[in-house]
Amino acid sequence: MSMVSEFKEFALKGNVMDLAVGVIIGGAFATITKSLVEDVIMPIVAFIVGGEINFKNMFLILGDAPEGVARTNDALKAAGIPVLAYGSFITVLINFLILAFIIFMMVKMVNRLRRADEVEEAIEEAIEEPSEEVQLLREISAKLGNINK
């Protein structure tokens, strides 16, 4: 089998295609979550706190910053000055926690639907096929009914 045909067989398997779709949707979902945090949640938090909250401006300068360089995270990094940008980390952490919670809720919902389907199938099977004892009792009842007539 040639390398091309092996790759084609691998790439067209259902699991690989499902994974590719999941990765693409996950990337888009991460962008949505980032926008949710930056454009919706943080402005609400800033309104409640009574001021603007910008985690990007939360950092520690590690070393000396030369004169004339603005004291912002982006300007210091552009100047090559080491900066401990813990505010950016907090933003990424909030994004992750929201994304993880949403995925957890989705998995929980899917599991609930699966369990409901399994219970429904079990009920249908139980209704469709009576147990051996029930079948035996029905046979005995039918024979007794024929004798009494």
Curated annotation (Swiss-Prot):
Predominant location category: membrane
Location in the cell: Cell inner membrane
Keyword Ion transport (UniProt): yes
Membrane-spanning ranges: 10-30, 41-61, 87-107
Gene Ontology MF annotations: mechanosensitive monoatomic ion channel activity
Its membrane topology: Multi-pass membrane protein
GO cellular component: plasma membrane
UniProt cross-references to InterPro entries, sorted A to Z: Mechanosensitive_channel_CS, MS_channel, MSC/AndL, MscL_channel
Keywords: Cell inner membrane, Cell membrane, Ion channel, Ion transport, Membrane, Transmembrane, Transmembrane helix, Transport
Gene3D superfamilies: Large-conductance mechanosensitive channel, MscL, domain 1
Annotated function: Channel that opens in response to stretch forces in the membrane lipid bilayer. May participate in the regulation of osmotic pressure changes within the cell.
Quaternary organization: Homopentamer.
Protein name: Large-conductance mechanosensitive channel
Source taxonomy: Bacteria, Pseudomonadati, Pseudomonadota, Gammaproteobacteria, Moraxellales
